[in-house]
C-alpha cells in the first residue's frame, strides 16, 4: 500500500493524503455476504443522544466477517483482497471446496491464491486460525477471542498485532498493541500474523468534509458553549473554567479522572496495564 499526496489546488486538498489501494484486487463486494445497516445518528430508542458527534455520512453495506473461524481442517483459497468501509483494515474473500465463501480480516502478506485453514492441526503461517494452546510462544497474532467460540474481539485494526509471550496453566500470556499484558484462555482462538493495511495511520484527512463523509459531526469546545449546555460555558469573552477541575458535559470530573473500575472481573486477568499515552 502506498500513500497518494495531492497538489495544493485548494486549502482542503493541500494537506490531504489517501491510500493508493494497490493491494485491492476486486472492487465489487460479494453480494451474499452483504447486509444493510441503518444509522441512528448517535440516538437511542428514545431519541436521546447517547453518542455525540455522530450523524450523516455515506451509506454503506455491512460486510459479514467470519471472526470465529470454526470451519476446521478445511483448506480455503483466497479469492480477492477487498476494501471495507466499515473498518480500517482490508478484508479477504476466501472460498472453501464446498463453494461456501466468507470474509476474513486480511493480514499482512496474504495474497490471492494462497491457502488458509483453521483448527488445531493448521500450520503456523499467516492467515491460519488456531487455539492459543497450539501457537508457539513469540508468535505475532491478531483477531483474538476473549471467550472461546465468541469470535475474535481484540487486535482487528489496520497494522496491529499482539505477541504471545508464554503459557501458564490454562491461560496464555499475551502482550497487546496498547502495551497491556493480560491472560487469555488457551482454548480461545487467534489468527497468525499482523493485520494488513499498516500505512493507514499515515493518511491525513485534510478537510472537515471528509470527516462528514464518515458520519462524524463537528466537535465544539465547552468553553464556547452557553452555561446550560456545558459546565465550562458562559462568561464574558474567553472566561476561565471557574471550577477546581475540568468537567465533562455532564458535570463529572475529567482529564485525568480514572474511568476503569478496579473491581472489574477482568482485572485479575490483567498482568500489566496499558502504557500511559
Curated annotation (Swiss-Prot):
The keyword RNA-binding applies. InterPro entries: NA-bd_OB-fold, Rib_uL2_dom2, Ribosomal_uL2, Ribosomal_uL2_bac/org-type, Ribosomal_uL2_C, Ribosomal_uL2_CS, Ribosomal_uL2_dom3, Ribosomal_uL2_RNA-bd_dom. Keywords: Ribonucleoprotein, Ribosomal protein, RNA-binding, rRNA-binding. One of its GO terms (cellular component) is large ribosomal subunit. Residues 220-277 are annotated as: Disordered. It comes from the Bacteria. GO terms for biological process: cytoplasmic translation. Pfam families: Ribosomal_L2, Ribosomal_L2_C. Residues 254-263 have a biased composition (Basic residues). GO terms for molecular function: rRNA binding; structural constituent of ribosome; transferase activity. Part of the 50S ribosomal subunit. Forms a bridge to the 30S subunit in the 70S ribosome. One of the primary rRNA binding proteins. Required for association of the 30S and 50S subunits to form the 70S ribosome, for tRNA binding and peptide bond formation. It has been suggested to have peptidyltransferase activity; this is somewhat controversial. Makes several contacts with the 16S rRNA in the 70S ribosome. HAMAP family: Ribosomal_uL2_B (MF_01320_B). Belongs to the universal ribosomal protein uL2 family. This is Large ribosomal subunit protein uL2. The gene is rplB.
